[in-house]
From Swiss-Prot:
Site (Cleavage): L109, P110, L323, V324, L419, L420, V544, G545
PTM annotation, UniProt: Gag polyprotein: Myristoylated. Myristoylation of the matrix (MA) domain mediates the transport and binding of Gag polyproteins to the host plasma membrane and is required for the assembly of viral particles.
Keywords: Aspartyl protease, Capsid protein, Host-virus interaction, Hydrolase, Lipoprotein, Metal-binding, Myristate, Phosphoprotein, Protease, Repeat, Viral budding, Viral budding via the host ESCRT complexes, Viral matrix protein, Viral nucleoprotein, Viral release from host cell, Virion, Zinc, Zinc-finger
Protein name: Gag-Pro polyprotein
Length: 571
């Protein structure tokens, strides 16, 4: 900041007294140099070391500085003594004596005359950073805040545009609005009292003080600008909206309510709040609510849709347990299970005593009452169906393979069970899929898709999407070679579920068929769902042999030809 040293005071002086000395040094003629500020700091160190006490205005007058040792420091002390003595006034001889306070309250007293003013120059970015660093921990409108800004103004003689830039750099938007309101009221009040050199016919005070030859008029505007910081309206202490974060056990509705209250208290009237609420309602939500919003494609949606998606979310609570070790007698052993109640009489199956009928060794398992509801095989119960093998492997067992961590969106056991019970037709294995996303046509929220384990990626027809969906060309390797003009990549997330209640899977990118022919559920979705396809064996396999028919019709019975289902090639 020019020739000014750091505003942080050296050891042996209070911040208010140090700011007074710096402001008094600004009135030296010629203007102070870096050596003058160095001499001033060396004088404070010398005074604190020799006098064994901090420097104050009453104890550190001009006589306390030895002449010729610290340069122009005696002139600085004399100027400060003259200004403060004229401002306070000497008490009369008949003034009643008062008991001094137990401590000297800190006070930053303004310098009435700034001396010879510097020529105007715009602040550099480095100087703005220095000013902000000095007052970042000070309250706006406090004495140290005002005195620091006054010193910065003395060195640069800023115009109203420079002061507005400084205000935007050091103050929050709320404080900027409050300061502008206070400054406008102060200018209107002073204009009514006829400012010195102000001509209403020449424009506003802001316009006239910006002229190169403004002189005292610019100084009056600067004083009003500083005075506006003192008159900032007091407001209750509210939590900034950027620090409001949803707690792990806090409902999403309460979190959004706190966010809206903070924005209403912090932002002035007329400032749009909806973009901030829409952004922070996802960014500051807890991890579980963020996963819900990601799965449903509502990351950038309005807050109303997010409230509907997370309204029924509740944290998973665990029963707390406290382990306390207390010295005392030996604790009893583990609790033994209660003995089973003996049967009241003999078993009605074998007519022997000692066991219940459900535990009778002569009990045999009869045939199932009907065919298996999964594979339609009448020879076994549902619990023994071989199609449940995949479920046992997922749960983990003696014959389970190595556990493969899914790509993302791990599913619960109940969700996996609802996926494994979807029947597939043999001729054309298809499943109903529920889709949602910003690029889908409104009518394509539910569709029938072909299950193809040979397709590496899921494919959608182009007529399911809006006209201007984000796309990039894709080269697909098929049976006939590489296709470069038929498929595109949809560059946008899409949410997919096999049942309306979920679970929901988010796919980052999908192949789009521009010929509108394929709707394929590929391995990318099947692996995310941890799905497996089980084909049961035939109950009565076909027999190859002679038929019981007339000789003219004797022949061999063959299986019907396999269905010709075009398979999407590996990519």
């Amino acid at each position: 900041m020019g020739n000014s040293p750091s505003y942080n005071p050296p050891a042996g002086i209070s911040p208010s007294d140090w700011l007074n000395l710096l402001q008094s040094a600004q009135r030296l003629n010629p203007r102070p140099s870096p050596s003058d500020f160095t001499d001033l700091k060396n004088y404070i160190h010398w005074f604190h070391k020799t006098q064994k006490k901090p420097w104050t205005f009453t104890s550190g007058g001009p006589a306390s500085c030895p002449p010729g040792k610290f340069g122009r420091v005696p002139l600085v002390l004399a100027t400060l003594n003259e200004v403060l003595s004229n401002d306070e006034g000497a008490p009369g001889a008949s003034a009643p004596e008062e008991q001094p306070p137990p401590y000297d309250p800190p006070a930053v007293l303004p310098i009435i005359s700034e001396g010879n003013r510097n020529r105007h120059r715009a602040w550099a970015l480095r100087e703005l950073q220095d000013i902000k660093k000095e007052i970042e921990n000070k309250a706006p409108g406090s004495q140290v805040w005002i005195q620091t800004l006054r010193l910065a103004i003395l060195q640069a003689d800023p115009t109203p545009a420079d002061l507005e830039q400084l205000c935007q750099y050091i103050a929050s938007p709320v404080d900027q609005t409050a300061h502008m309101t206070s400054l406008t009221a102060a200018i209107a009040a002073e204009a009514a009292n006829t400012l010195q050199g102000f001509n209403p016919k020449m424009g506003t005070l802001t316009q006239q003080s910006a002229q190169p030859n403004a002189g005292d008029l610019r100084s009056q505007y600067q004083n009003l600008w500083l005075q506006a910081w003192k008159n900032l309206p007091t407001r209750p202490s509210v939590q900034p909206w950027s620090t409001i974060v949803q707690g792990p056990a806090e409902s999403y509705v309460e979190f959004v309510n706190r966010l809206q209250i903070s924005l209403a208290d912090n932002l002035p009237d007329g400032v749009p709040k909806e973009p901030i609420i829409d952004s922070l309602s996802y960014a500051n939500a807890n991890k579980e609510c963020q996963q819900i919003l990601q799965g449903r494609g509502l990351v950038a949606a309005p807050v109303g849709q997010k409230l509907q998606a997370c309204a029924h979310w509740a944290p998973k609570t665990k029963q707390p347990a406290i382990l306390v070790h207390t010295p005392g007698p030996k604790m009893p052993g583990p609790r033994q299970p209660a003995p089973k109640r003996p049967p009241p009489g003999p078993c009605y199956r074998c007519l022997k005593e000692g066991h219940w009928a459900r535990d009778c060794p002569t009990k045999t398992t009869g045939p199932p009452p009907g065919p298996c509801p999964i594979c339609k095989d009448p020879s076994h119960w549902k619990r023994d169906c071989p199609t449940l093998k995949s479920k046992k492997l997922i749960e983990g067992g003696p014959s389970a393979p190595q556990i493969i961590t899914p790509i993302t969106d791990s599913l619960s056991e109940a969700e996996l069970e609802c996926l494994l019970s979807i029947p597939l037709a043999r001729s054309r294995p298809s499943v109903a899929v529920y889709l949602s996303g910003p690029w889908l046509q409104p009518s394509q929220n539910q569709a029938l898709m072909l299950v193809d384990t040979g397709a590496e990626n899921t494919v959608l027809p182009q007529n399911w999407l809006v006209r201007d969906y984000p796309r990039t060309p894709a080269a697909v390797l098929g049976a006939g070679g590489i296709s470069r003009n038929r498929y595109n990549w949809l560059q946008g997330p899409l949410t997919l579920a096999l049942k309306p209640e979920g679970p929901f899977i988010t796919i980052p990118k999908i192949l789009v068929d521009t010929f509108d022919k394929w709707q394929i559920l590929g391995r990318d979705v099947l692996s995310r769902l941890q799905a497996s396809i089980s084909i049961p064996e035939e109950v009565h396999p076909p027999v190859v042999g002679v038929l019981d028919a007339p000789p003219s019709h004797i022949g061999l019975e063959h299986l019907p030809p396999p269905p010709e289902v075009p398979q999407f090639p590996l990519n």
